[in-house]
Amino acid sequence: MSTTVIILAAGKGTRMRSQLPKVLQPLAGRPLLGHVIKTAKQLLAENIITIYGHGGDHVKKTFAQENIQWVEQAEQLGTGHAVQMTLPVLPKDGISLILYGDVPLARQTTLEQLIEASNKTGIGMITLHVDNPTGYGRIVRQDGKIQAIVEHKDATEAQRQIQEINTGIYCVSNAKLHEWLPKLSNENAQGEYYLTDIVAMAVADGLEIASIQPELAFEVEGVNDRLQLAALEREFQKQQAKELMQQGVTFADPARFDLRGTVKVGHDVRIDVNVIIEGDCELGDFVEIGAGCILKNTTIAAGTKVQAYSVFDGAVVGENTQIGPFARLRPGAKLANEVHIGNFVEVKNTTIGLGSKANHFTYLGDAEIGAESNIGAGTITCNYDGANKHKTTIGDAVFIGSNSSLVAPVTIGNGATVGAGSVITKDVAEQSLSFERAQQISKANYQRPQKLKK
C-alpha cells in the first residue's frame, strides 16, 4: 500500500521568541523540519506533503531541493483544519502518516511499526505512558481497545488517573481521511478543528484503532520553546553517544560530545571531551580525537591521532598520521599516510605525500607536496595575487627552511633545499640549494637609544 507523509509545519512558535520560524530552529545541526523530512524519505514515502504557514517562504526556500508538495494553511484553525488543507492533493487510495515539524525525532523503525499496524485496521496512533500526564489528552480504553481521547480539561477525576497519553502521531487510510475530515466541526471552546475527532469517528464506524508505543520517549517530544529545544538536544546527543559506544567508541565523557550529522566508526576509536562532529564523517580503527576538536565532512584513516583543538572541514587524512594541536584542515586537504601536521598549521586545497611534515606555524594553500618532505616553521605558500589563486608544487624529499615564503606559481624540485628566511619567486631545480635574503650587517659596539629625561 502506498504511503503519504503529511507534515504539519505551519505554527508560528511564539514562545521561541525568534524571527526564525519554529520548524527551522536547529537541533543537532539540522532544522527541526529537516529531521522529519529525512525520516519521511527513509520510509520511502511516495508523497511528502508539508503544510506551511508562518514564515512559509523561508521554510520553502530552505527545503527547495526536496521533492515536497507544499500546501498553505493561511489561517491556523487547528490540527484538523491543517490536514483538511491537503485534501485537494491527497491521493484517494493508500495510507497517510501524519507527523509534525516540531516533533523531530520519531524514528524510522517506530513509524514503520505504526504503518504496518495501521494497514491492518485503517487507523493507528502512537501513544505513550508517562508518570505525569497532566495537560495531555488521555487514551480511554474499554477491554483494551481505544474508545476515545479525552483532553485533560474535559477529563473526569478517574480519567485523569490514566497515564497513557495521545502523542498526536496518526496513520490513517486516505479513503477515511477523505470521508472524515470534511465532517470535522469547530464547535468547541477554541473554535478550532481538532484532528483528534477522527478517533471518535473511527469508533463510531466500528474500526479498531491500532496503537504502538515508541521505544524512546523523546521520539514523540515536541518543541515549543528554547528550554524544550535544549532538553531534546541533550537527550538526542545522549542517545547518539550511546549508539556509538555500542559500536566500540570510547568517550572520555559521553555527555560532552555532539554529533550534528553522521559518523561511521571503526574499532577502538577514542574521543575526548567537547568534540563536535558535523556533516558526514568517517573514523577508522584506533583513531584518537583530542579534546575540543571539530570535524566536518572529514575522513580519517586508521591509527591517526588528532591532538586537542584541531579543526577539520572537508579533509581526507591517511593512516598513522599525527595532527595538532591547534591545526586547521580546510576543504581539499588530502594527507597521505604518516604525515605530521603540527600546531598552528593550516592546510587548504593541498595534497601532502607519504611521511611529509609541517610541524609549526605554517600555511599550505593550493599546493602539492611530495613524500618525505619537511616544511619548516613559518613557511607560507603565497597563493593569492590579489585576483587569482596559484599553485605551489613541492617534490619529494624537499627541505624548506624556516620562515620561507614560496610565491606561487612556483615549483620546488625533488631533493631541493630552500634556505631559511627566503622569498622564492622562481622554480628551484632538483637537488639544488636556493636562498634569497639580504646580506647581514653587523655593527660593533652598538649603543641602544636611551630614554629622554623629562
From Swiss-Prot:
PROSITE patterns (UniProt xref): HEXAPEP_TRANSFERASES
InterPro entries: Bifunctional_GlmU, GlmU-like, GlmU_C_LbH, Hexapep, Hexapep_transf_CS, MobA-like_NTP_Trfase, Nucleotide-diphossugar_trans, Trimer_LpxA-like_sf
Region (Linker): 227-247
Cofactors: Mg(2+)
Annotated metabolic or biological route of this protein: Nucleotide-sugar biosynthesis; UDP-N-acetyl-alpha-D-glucosamine biosynthesis; N-acetyl-alpha-D-glucosamine 1-phosphate from alpha-D-glucosamine 6-phosphate (route II): step 2/2; Nucleotide-sugar biosynthesis; UDP-N-acetyl-alpha-D-glucosamine biosynthesis; UDP-N-acetyl-alpha-D-glucosamine from N-acetyl-alpha-D-glucosamine 1-phosphate: step 1/1; Bacterial outer membrane biogenesis; LPS lipid A biosynthesis
Gene3D superfamilies: Hexapeptide repeat proteins, Spore Coat Polysaccharide Biosynthesis Protein SpsA, Chain A
Pfam families cross-referenced by the UniProt entry: Hexapep, NTP_transf_3
Binding site for acetyl-CoA: A377, N383, Y384, S402, A420, R437
Cellular localization per UniProt: Cytoplasm
Binding site for Mg(2+): D102, N224
Enzyme's top EC category: transferase
Active site feature: H360 (proton acceptor)
Cofactor binding comment, as recorded: Binds 1 Mg(2+) ion per subunit.
GO cellular component: cytoplasm; membrane
Span list, region N-acetyltransferase: 248-454
GO biological process, one term: peptidoglycan biosynthetic process
Alphabetical UniProt keywords: Acyltransferase, Cell shape, Cell wall biogenesis/degradation, Cytoplasm, Magnesium, Metal-binding, Multifunctional enzyme, Nucleotidyltransferase, Peptidoglycan synthesis, Repeat, Transferase
Enzyme Commission numbers on file: 2.7.7.23, 2.3.1.157
Known catalytic reactions: alpha-D-glucosamine 1-phosphate + acetyl-CoA = N-acetyl-alpha-D-glucosamine 1-phosphate + CoA + H(+); N-acetyl-alpha-D-glucosamine 1-phosphate + UTP + H(+) = UDP-N-acetyl-alpha-D-glucosamine + diphosphate
Source organism, top-level taxon: Bacteria
HAMAP family, per database record: GlmU
Function: Catalyzes the last two sequential reactions in the de novo biosynthetic pathway for UDP-N-acetylglucosamine (UDP-GlcNAc). The C-terminal domain catalyzes the transfer of acetyl group from acetyl coenzyme A to glucosamine-1-phosphate (GlcN-1-P) to produce N-acetylglucosamine-1-phosphate (GlcNAc-1-P), which is converted into UDP-GlcNAc by the transfer of uridine 5-monophosphate (from uridine 5-triphosphate), a reaction catalyzed by the N-terminal domain.
PANTHER family, sorted: BIFUNCTIONAL PROTEIN GLMU, NUCLEOTIDYL TRANSFERASE
Protein family (similarity comment): In the N-terminal section; belongs to the N-acetylglucosamine-1-phosphate uridyltransferase family.
Oligomeric form and interacting partners: Homotrimer.
Protein name according to UniProt: Bifunctional protein GlmU
Source organism per UniProt: Acinetobacter baumannii (strain SDF)
Gene: glmU
